[in-house]
């Protein structure tokens, strides 16, 4: 696969992987060719829902050549780090989850925390980190889910029981403001 296979492909949102998360796949090559944000869903054939969902945030790559012809290669954004969590084309879930506490841009974190929607081999520490983020950033996460009209994501958030009374009221107000009767 060439390095430019997804060049100028800005509408790609999901990669559906027709395999289990334990299997070796071509996901490493795919996400390595995409610098924009993309979600990968491990959704085996014949199953009603994905077994695992992963988010690969966007990142930027800069290559600068100095007068001495030394190349300075820098990466901005956590997306590059997430794309390195593979060994022999198999996902390394512990390494993937260890990146989350290192910080993200505001938009990425609200999506990353929703990994609890399709968890796979989460350690207790990783689960707690995602839950803690959701508890303290419910409004931000709900705003993103409402904007995307992701009713299933909102149901998942409610089922995680991370919203206190104030957060629930804030969510209802956001849903009403977004004119989303189903979410309200």
Regions found by a protein language model. Give the residues of each.
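Solvent-exposed loop and capping/linker segments of extracellular ligand-binding repeat ectodomains
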Residues: 1-184
